[in-house]
């Protein structure tokens, strides 16, 4: 279902059709434990589409992701306090990929958020802040 949702396209470029498409996508990749009601999700997506919808930019980003090979060498060069946060319920990027990223960054900490998918719904913000704020305090000490 994830690949099908990623490869799907809106019925047209009309804002409502684009919003429908992204509601379907976020329903597949979203956080199962931080559910956003469809009306709220649709309103947020429609506001974003109305503000700035650039399908060519989205396609460029997808092509860049697919063309990329590895950043392993670059990750080893990071020299600042690093926290890698990953959703345990992310259907798009496996948890092991987030763990691998953290392992490759010297001194990095890894935190997996239960019930978080490949999105940032309002409900997950508190869970992220619980791990992010202590990290920021330690980094600035």
Give residue ranges: language-model regions:
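Hydrophobic/aromatic residue at the end of a short beta strand that borders the catalytic acidic motif
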Residues: 25, 93, 120
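Solvent-exposed polar/charged
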Residues: 76-77, 103-104, 134
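Active-site acidic short loop of glycosyltransferases
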Residues: 79-80, 107
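Catalytic active-site module of serine/aspartate enzymes centered on a nucleophile-bearing elbow/loop
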Residues: 107-141
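Short beta-strand/loop motif that positions the catalytic acidic residue
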Residues: 78, 84-86, 90
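Alpha/beta-hydrolase
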Residues: 1-73, 80
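Conserved alpha/beta-hydrolase "acid-adjacent" motif
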Residues: 91-97
